[in-house]
Amino acid sequence: MISVRDVSKRFGEKLAVDDVTFEAEQGSITYLLGPNGAGKTTVMRMIAGLTRTSSGTISVNGSGLRDFRDTISEIGFSLGAFARNPGHTAEQHLRWQARLGGLTTSDIGPVLYRVGLDQVAKRPVGKFSYGMLQRLGIASALLGDPKTLVLDEPANGLDIEGIIWLRELLLGLAAEGKCLLVASHNLTEVEITGTRVVIMGKGKVLSDTSKDELVTAGSGPRPLESAYVAITKDSVEYAATGGTR
């Protein structure tokens, strides 16, 4: 479980995250949505301990991140597809992460197989496609079989097969009782897999409700999309008129 309580973050004069509160529960897929610049990535970096909060508290499975003696079994992160040494193979990349987490190298093979990279385990990641890098990031998050996972835009760069694979993976992990917090712009996947949806805009929480309640609030042939657009209409930094004049 992830609990974010009254969290704010300032970068100089800019208030990037403003009094954000929400929870992501075990056995569920909680999506964090919002326009570019809404503060989603900053929130995720604060959960990961990469950015300090200016105020408020964050707990994971009832404890602060620094209180864990075995963090890798509590929470896993995939926050950027390019946080890799391009000269390392996929196997080497996971090996040093496993060692840092106190795991053995025997934990690496099953994870590479689960994300579909077992056949390219000895290929340098500098030769990976964007979609393969996304799979490697998810493999990193899965090391240690953590109770909680935080994934930032995991579907970016995936082809159709990859999106279907990711969908089944997320649903399977939730069915195992894991807590998943996922930032996304893919409303189709949110509608298929989501349990709860938190929508941010300009650093604030604009909506925090179940996926089903959000869909019910929408209208037309794409109700989730219509509800999202209505909620975020005053928070879009780069608005355009599309094909109209």
Each predicted region: which residue ranges?
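Helix-to-loop junction immediately C-terminal to a conserved catalytic motif
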Residues: A48
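Conserved ABC transporter NBD signature motif
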Residues: G56-T71
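Conserved ABC ATPase "signature" region
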Residues: R95, R99, T105-A121
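Catalytic Walker B motif of ABC-type/P-loop ATPase nucleotide-binding domains
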Residues: L149-E153
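Helical segment within the ABC ATPase nucleotide-binding domain
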Residues: I163-E176
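A short, surface-exposed alpha-helical micro-motif characterized by mixed small hydrophobic
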Residues: V190-I192
